[in-house]
């Protein structure tokens, strides 16, 4: 009996150790998700929050799907997310490669470059709102000193999204740089030495050694920055509040305004569910894409 009891304890120990983590995830992730789904199926707003909530089924979902403002917010989200991912990944990769070199001063530069990521997105938003201000902004002042006309960075629907993308790039790129730098340091230098002996150039080594070995880091980084960009709204709220004319209102900002500014909690919950679905689809797509490319390379 003692041996059987000892065997049970030994086999149950890993599951017992998981209980605290699973409990926290359940409380902070699963319970809010279930509650969000419950809200989306009822008519809930600030005006009737203390009264009985009427069950409306999928009525809220059909209203959101036919809402032209929601369609516009999805288009803005697509532009914002694609621009943010492209710039953050490209600039982050360049900085990671440059600052992973064993040169004096790179540690100090890495510490300096990580500051924008540590700074609150709200502070970043206020800073870039001042920089891009049409009347007294630093950027337009510089353009005027060079004899150029000032640009309506934040009040022109054609430029506002890309202006916010630049601000988000400044805020988020340090994470990509740090993450990919960790990946670069995990690659054994002997691999590069062998490639150099075989006559491989720096560029060939980067595309045929560095990038393939960085795939796990690149995949995780892309998933994270995509999800963060889809859910990002505080910097946009500070810089433009979704304007002008709804041209910088992303789906996450639209959800926030509908739920907390206009008090339409059910509508906000539905948009939140759609955002969760978008995040899951994008994450799954990234994983499938990387696996497919891996299988193609292995088949060669």
Where are these regions (language model features)?
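N-terminal hydrophobic targeting signals that begin at the initiator methionine
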Residues: 1-4
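A structural signal for multi-pass alpha-helical bundles of membrane permease subunits
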Residues: 6-300
